[in-house]
Structures are given as structure tokens and as C-alpha cells.
Amino acid sequence: MTIYMGSARLGANGKATGDAVGDQKQTSTPDYKGEVSMQTLSSFIGSKKWYVIRAKQCAHGMALGNAMKIACNNKHLGYDQSNRLGVISYGINTTTNTECDCSSLVRACIKYATGKDVGNFTTDNAVTTIGKSGLFDKAIVYKANMKIYTGDIIVTQSKGHIGICTDGYSRQTTSLVKNGVNYGHVLDPIYYADCNPDLKNAFGYDEAKLLNHFLQFGCNESSRWGKTISDFNVQVYASHSPDLVQVFGALKSDGSNGFVYYKHYCEFGHNENRRTV
């Protein structure tokens, strides 16, 4: 599966400022060449170090991906840091030629997708400012082969660049839902298989079989801690949730009561901004 990111990249003049208003490089849609355009995740990531910021609500995530697509395919929206707040004034679907930079564009997309303006930020303080909105989970470090979902915001760990995933894995999948609980919050089948060679040998990347194993066995095996999905470790979750320990008891060293902690996070914890890694 090819993952795509959208972002405000650079002016047609090859500089951060001084370009004509609007996207001078866009020639067609979907736009993969413009000042504001899409590119593959691998070309977006390059060699830099990144954080991933994920919306708490699936609907917001899907809306963020759609918002960035609208922006990337809008020929009236170009790149120029000297007029970076133009997109805030006119919006991502503007019919008036205007400008943005990478951070102001993400701000505008968040506003379009959620109805909330998180305020001005740059790549230096994006994690803090976006996090204060209450709309997103705690930022996590990007790792190679991490499952990136449509709507995920990816920002450099230091001053640099920021964008939104326009085409990634869907958080609306029903394949990881069991008895009304979405275990996709704690289980990434590909990650689970890759981190557990015995399971990969037995099941390959079969989502149904890996979910079944997780629910029957893996969730209660300490040897699987930190090996179900990149951004959730049940041991960390339990150790930083003393209120849950009072209800469920301490997490046993063999992991045999792990299921209740996994299930709690899927049903409640992921919306409560609890620490998971």
C-alpha cells in the first residue's frame, strides 16, 4: 500500500518567499507537483526524525485527510512564508489566490475538519500547540514501518516540516472490531506479525487470524508487551493508570490479566489522553 502525504512544500521560484500568489506549479489534479501538493510518505519522510499526531476521533482523522486533499488540489493556494496566514483568512477551498506555509496550512486543515482553530504555530511548537486543543492523542515518535492512518499529522522533531496523511490506512475498518469494540487502537496486525515471528510464520499477515490470536492468547501474554502496535504498551498503560489498578488489580508479571487493560483503552482510554508508551 502506498501512503501519501500532503503539505505546503515550496514556492515555484524555489524559495520560501517572493513568489507570485497562488500555486504556479499545479498543472493537474490530483496534484503531486505543485507548491501545495501530495507526495509519497517515503519521499516526505526522507532522513529526518518525526512525530506523529493522531486525532482522537476517527471522523476527525478522515476529515483531516480530506481537508488536505482539498488544499493540495486547489490551484488558488500557493506557498509563501511572507503571506502564510492568507489560508487562515480565506480557507483551504479559497477561490481567491492566496498563500500558506506548511504549518499554517495544517492549522487551516484542522479548523476545516474539526471546527476548532488551535491557534498559530510553527514546526517548532506544533506538538505543544496542537496537543493543547484536546482533539489529538499524545504525539508519538515515528518509526519505520509504522502504520500511518489517513489524517495523521506528521511533524519534524525539530524545526523543519509538517504535513497530513491524505491516503493512509483507514481507521474506519471493521476487521478489527469484535463485539462492538475496536481493537485497532491496540493492535496493528502487520506490526504484531513482524514483532512476533512465531505468529508471522503461523498466520502471515491474515488480520482475522491475528486478531483471534490476540484476543485468545496474546493480550494475556507478557512476552507480547509492546509488540501489538507501535504506540501502545499495556505495561506502561497500567503503570500510569493507578485508578485502573484499583479496579482491575495490578498487571500480573505473566500478563494473564492484560485483556481488561487492553479493552479499557479501546473503549475509554484512547479518548482520555492516558499515557501508553
Q: What do the predicted segments below correspond to?
A:
Residues 112-135, 167:
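Short, basic/aromatic beta-hairpin or loop at an interaction surface
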Residues 150-152:
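Loop/turn positions that initiate beta-strands
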